[in-house]
């Protein structure tokens, strides 16, 4: 009889053979535009700290002050002993920032998606999601028990065809999409999705994780960027990317948020967000409001890199994520290593995370022109044209 765990070693060998095996890399000290990685100083193009707030002294001071006042942990679920005034202050600030009636904060963005999706739909319902949606949206859909179907990436035509074919068989229908797609950098056709939702009587949940703080005139996300403010939808986002903290949020009308507060298992049955993370996220919103030049500098950096690499097959992007597809996982690893040797940290992204391997570069507001020029030169020397 085989040992019950013997298959794990075989599976690890398969991952190695396919060049899919992953290992952690240890960064010393704070993150930022330049990092210390395993004894080397590298320019960091793998961070989602888009505005460079995670190491901002005001963020750190806010986290320290909250820890001194409230302690290191929230000490319970929000419905029991884990709710503090700073949690509600953050939720109200997010609601105002997103131009929504109310908001609810989860302990992570992943939990926000799982909890929200699973309490909105069930076995009698239909979910239609973009094929390139984030793992948290896909897993939330599976866990809900609803019938789940995917439409071709950013295809309004395929989405409507599936609505025509299936919508009438189900009680409720939920449309799911990232606004900025995390492994491509492109943006969903939000206005078209909302128009179809009105025609076919669907709820809409958008994941603003990579748009919050980055997209739109005020940095509120793609709902603003696409001119869809005031439309009826549910917005989810994260506090761990441009906001430089940890946690996730959901915004919408007051009744929806009240319903989520009463039904979302990943909010009800978990400890509240730590005081430090909560206070840091609240400070980030204030910095974003007061310093629009950070976001402007980020987009200047994005546009500079795009203009210098227009001869390469970069995937279309208006966000801080720029991707160069390559032939296979082995080539992705090889090119990432070449860049590492030139002082650039940009890990290879491989299946099953993405269908086709690629190098993924993320811009930050704190990258200097010199950092960007090193990246452009290194890519030119490393990538086949």
From Swiss-Prot:
GO terms for biological process: biotin biosynthetic process. It catalyses: 6-carboxyhexanoyl-[ACP] + L-alanine + H(+) = (8S)-8-amino-7-oxononanoate + holo-[ACP] + CO2. The keyword Transmembrane does not apply. Pyridoxal 5'-phosphate binds at residues 109-110, 182, 207-210, 238-241. Keywords: Biotin biosynthesis, Pyridoxal phosphate, Transferase. GO terms for molecular function: 8-amino-7-oxononanoate synthase activity; pyridoxal phosphate binding. This is Putative 8-amino-7-oxononanoate synthase. It comes from Microcystis aeruginosa (strain NIES-843 / IAM M-2473). The gene is bioF.
